[in-house]
Amino acid sequence: MNKYEVVKLIGVGGEAKALLVKRINSDKLYVMKQRMFFLLEEANEGLCEAMSLAKIQSPYIVRFEEVFLDNNSNMFSLCIVMEYCEGGDLMDNLFKRISDSFLKNSGLNNNQNNNNNNNNNLNSIVNNNILNNNKNSKQSTTNTNSSGSNSSIASNTTNNNNNNNNINNNNNLKAYENFFSKYVPSETLKGVNQLVEPNCNKDNNKPIEITTTDSPRIIINDNESTNNLNSQSDQILQFSISSESSSFSNNDLINSPNSNDSNLHQSSSNSSICGDYSSPPNLEKISSPGTSTPYQKGSNGNTVNIRCSDIVVEAVSPIKTESIGCQIRSTTSPCTSGPTSPQMIPLNIVEQPPQSTSTSKTDSSPTGADVKKTKMTWWKTYKSSKKDKKQTICSNACESFSNSTFFNDPSSHSQPQHQQLHSSPQQLPQSPRLKPNIESSLNINGNNNNNNCSTLLKLPRKLFYTWIYQICLGVQSIHKNHLVHLDLKSENIFLSESQKIKIGDFGLAKKYENSMSGVAGTYYYLSPEILLNKNYSRPADIFSLGCIFYEMYTLNLLPLTKRSFGQELIEGKFDRKAFKQEFDDSDEPIADLILDMLNLDQNLRPTIDLILQNKLFERISDINSSFNNLLNIVNNTGSSITNSKSNSSNNLNNSNSNNDIINNNNNNNSSNNINNNNIVNLNNSYNNKQDKCEQRNKSLNQNGFLSTSSMGSISSSFNEHEFVRRQLEKNDLDAAADVLCEAFKEEPRFQFVSGATSDNLETKNKSIELGQTIRKSFFTMCVRLMFDNKFMLWGCFDYENKLIAVACWSTPGKSGAPPMTQLIVKILSMLPKFGFRTMKRIGKIMSNIDKAMKNHDSKLDVYYLPYIGVSKEYRDLGVGQYLLKPVIEWAEHQRKTVKAVVFSQKQINFFSKLGLSVGHTEKITNLKGINSIYVMSKNSQY
């Protein structure tokens, strides 16, 4: 601790606390997590766990700087120093994007530059709208006199323009309010769909009263609110997203005490016309020093503070849904949802006609012809909104942002991990989430583009896929180190200053050995098996990852919407159809992927490797591999230049020591020598790479099937992201047959079939040509037959999208080969082409393999690998192991056995590196050149 200086306390809870520190004599910031222990043995155990976490090396994991024990009086403090992420956490970022997007698109973010313009703050919107809606001849005369030389015609024109601006601003605020109403439990929305026209007081000096149906009165003081909006120095947008108790009722709002009016009136001076914020059950209230408390004097409860960049706006409460000049029509959405899925609340906002007689006639509600026209032009409107999505959603996608104060409310930060689950799921109310109807015209910018919230409130597409890809890479590095995070959530995913993803908070991480049990994590992200207190493992992280992806796409933050997918799955209330309706049609693949990750059966969830090989990430992985290749070239070039310069400088120093006087000619010669040395070294480095490639190709083993040389061990230079693995499609089958045909050229079983092991010299000479024909015909037939019978055909592609490796898997329940009837028919069709002798050899091979498999284990509930092959030029890069790992890990999660049949010791060595062992050896006497058939298997570890 003597090396660090505490800057501020970030969070406290239970036995642990988090500090923002900086190293003495340095301005670099770090995050230090301290945990107190009474016993030295427990502290040492925690130290060992922290050291194992520090071994994880990944750019997408929060870096551990230092881990040490500090003796503090009678207690021991375990201190973990980690890098500080300037970008904050992902939940802060998502919520700030929500607020900034609305403010940006509504034009409210220019409020600071237009403080004198009454149309740009909430108070003047209310006042001007009421004045314009209640115009009469006396008010018109007053306005004309106050304007000096302006004529009555100019006054009426100004009033009309102001009225239009007010309606647009009201629509902006209404869109903002309607979005955040998704964070309000459904009970509080009952009876609030119809708004009542406000009554205007003739005396402008009195507070203006705005009354709504089924909600308490709100009193806005004309003078105080304007001053407060301009006098706030912290620039905080305040609003509320739920009520006080966990059981919500609209009657509680109606039957509130009379003193509530005075409280509301008092809170208006603090810019808080809000209800209460109900923190999720897993969050704890922590008072952070140096930050303003979220509890405002005179408010009815917790007020959520959102820091905005330019203004202070007192948002209309979503619970009370007051708005002037707007009316919400409660219509039935064509996309109805399930029992616990989000309630669809279409928001058709239309302008209300003013309630006064005036010479200027305003528009009324849309007529039947207008409605018909709107329906006819819906698709064009939808297409235009999709086309302009990049302009409407957050344009500053990758821009650095300051930490939002929304989660300065410590209730939104995590508790100590051992206390994170203390509320019963049954006590949590179901909450609606708003999916705006495409036909609802929110008219954010005051034009007729009919933009909707789903268009406005969405992460930029490229940023979304980049972030989830980086998160997956971070989780992959965790699982590769045999760890399970167990507390993946958006609050534990951080952003660096350059907006790169960093996964942190490993307080609940466990070493993966066998399956684990016990409840751990954050309720809204917990998988069903954890909620049911069953055994769990890495699939629990996959489930949490699916929850995070859902949050990032829909911006429905689960701790605020009070939604638990795990609980819905357990109760059988999860509606897949309604879930997919929250995604655009063009993004159906990501919806399907998330649904797979949220599968109730943990054995059916994809592994992190399978997720990374999804087609969604192909382009990103190609870009990353190209970038990594470029970095390697730059690094190699830079190192060679550095070495050449150091060598030349050493030569110059030696010459200086021998000669005291150096003339200009010698200097010129030495500089020329330096340049020449650089060129020579660069050429040498390039030539060395070519020599290595040639040596590699020359040293390739001719055995093209399952040998250590043909498959290759993963070398230190192997980069997984240079290749893409995926399941093959129908148009890939011909290329797959070619790869297998070339790879099995020297494989023992095909050597026997082609006659290469025969004692007859003439047969040996014909074996090369015959073997090529046999392999080509056999694999063309076999690959198509396996594809038709739903075998798993995996392929690995290089950066040019060329197929370089193929693996054929039979899934549990299959016999390991295509149906015998179909196979016999196909083989008999080859009889006229190859003759009876060749077909007899094929039959011998197949019967011996089948015998070996049955003698080992006759169960069909296994993953069996009949064929795998890699192109010759890629056999020493570890492509074979890379291609097989996803299915092997998938089998581990499903607790299934993996089997393969091999014919040589080299092939045994290859599979041993993947965890397979020889389970049975079948001695062979009737196959020349083959002494034994080995059945290798890997049983599930849990």
From Swiss-Prot:
It is an enzyme of class 2 (transferase). Residues 4-617 form the Protein kinase domain. SMART domains: S_TKc. The keyword Coiled coil applies. InterPro entries: Acyl_CoA_acyltransferase, GNAT_dom, Kinase-like_dom_sf, NEK_Ser/Thr_kinase, Prot_kinase_dom, Ser/Thr_kinase_AS. ATP binds at I10, G11, V12, G13, G14, E15, A16, K17, A18, K33. Belongs to the protein kinase superfamily. Ser/Thr protein kinase family. This is Probable serine/threonine-protein kinase DDB_G0279719. It comes from Dictyostelium discoideum.
